[in-house]
Amino acid sequence: QGRPPGPPIPP
């Protein structure tokens, strides 16, 4: 929650 769904943010 707090962030829209989608692919993870790369490091």
UniProtKB/Swiss-Prot annotation:
Q: Could you tell me in which tissues this protein is expressed?
A: Expressed by the venom gland.
Q: What UniProt keywords apply to this chain's record, in alphabetical order?
A: Hypotensive agent, Metalloenzyme inhibitor, Metalloprotease inhibitor, Protease inhibitor, Pyrrolidone carboxylic acid, Secreted, Toxin
Where's it found, cell-wise? Secreted
Q: Which residues cross the membrane?
A: none
GO molecular function terms noted in the UniProt entry: peptidase inhibitor activity; toxin activity
The Gene Ontology biological process terms listed for this entry are:
regulation of blood pressure
A GO CC term?
extracellular region
Instruction: Write down which residues bear the modification named Pyrrolidone carboxylic acid.
Output: 1
Give the primary localization class.
secreted
What does the similarity note say? Belongs to the bradykinin-potentiating peptide family.
Function, as annotated, reads: This peptide both inhibits the activity of the angiotensin-converting enzyme (ACE) and enhances the action of bradykinin by inhibiting the peptidases that inactivate it. It acts as an indirect hypotensive agent.
Q: What is this protein called?
A: Bradykinin-potentiating peptide 1
> Where does this protein come from, organism-wise?
Gloydius halys (Chinese water mocassin)
